[in-house]
Swiss-Prot record:
Pfam family, one: eIF-1a
Keywords: Cytoplasm, Initiation factor, Protein biosynthesis, RNA-binding, rRNA-binding
HAMAP family referenced in this protein's UniProt entry, alphabetically: IF_1
Gene Ontology CC: one annotated term: cytosol
Protein name: Translation initiation factor IF-1 1
Domain of life: Bacteria
PROSITE patterns reported for this sequence: S1_IF1_TYPE (PS50832)
Subcellular location: Cytoplasm
Function: One of the essential components for the initiation of protein synthesis. Stabilizes the binding of IF-2 and IF-3 on the 30S subunit to which N-formylmethionyl-tRNA(fMet) subsequently binds. Helps modulate mRNA selection, yielding the 30S pre-initiation complex (PIC). Upon addition of the 50S ribosomal subunit IF-1, IF-2 and IF-3 are released leaving the mature 70S translation initiation complex.
Subunit field text: Component of the 30S ribosomal translation pre-initiation complex which assembles on the 30S ribosome in the order IF-2 and IF-3, IF-1 and N-formylmethionyl-tRNA(fMet); mRNA recruitment can occur at any time during PIC assembly.
InterPro entries: NA-bd_OB-fold, RNA-binding_domain_S1_IF1, TIF_IF1
Length: 89
């Protein structure tokens, strides 16, 4: 996946969390593929759970693998607001 112009961007839902930080994702069109977290998501420790809606990039040469680039936030159904994460120094 070296050339950005050739990447295919899709959205899907995480169906299952697999070992080694991989995920089984079902795309909007019904196809299932294996995806991994992108580098910035690992760097900033963005956690992806089963049921999350994600954006991912795929190579046109191998449509069975993808890279998760964004986790979409679902609106919360009432309750308490989100707590800010504790700051570490």
């Amino acid at each position: 996946m070296s050339n950005k112009e050739q990447l295919i961007e899709m959205q899907g839902k995480v169906d299952e969390v697999l070992p080694d930080s991989r995920f089984r994702v079902v795309l909007e069109n019904g196809h299932t593929l294996i995806a991994y977290s992108g580098g910035k998501m690992r760097k900033h420790r963005i956690r992806v759970l089963a049921g999350d809606t994600v954006s991912l990039e795929m190579s046109p040469y191998d449509l069975t693998k993808g890279r998760i680039t964004f986790r979409h936030l679902e609106p919360r159904a009432g309750g308490a607001p989100r707590r800010p994460s504790p700051h570490r120094r």
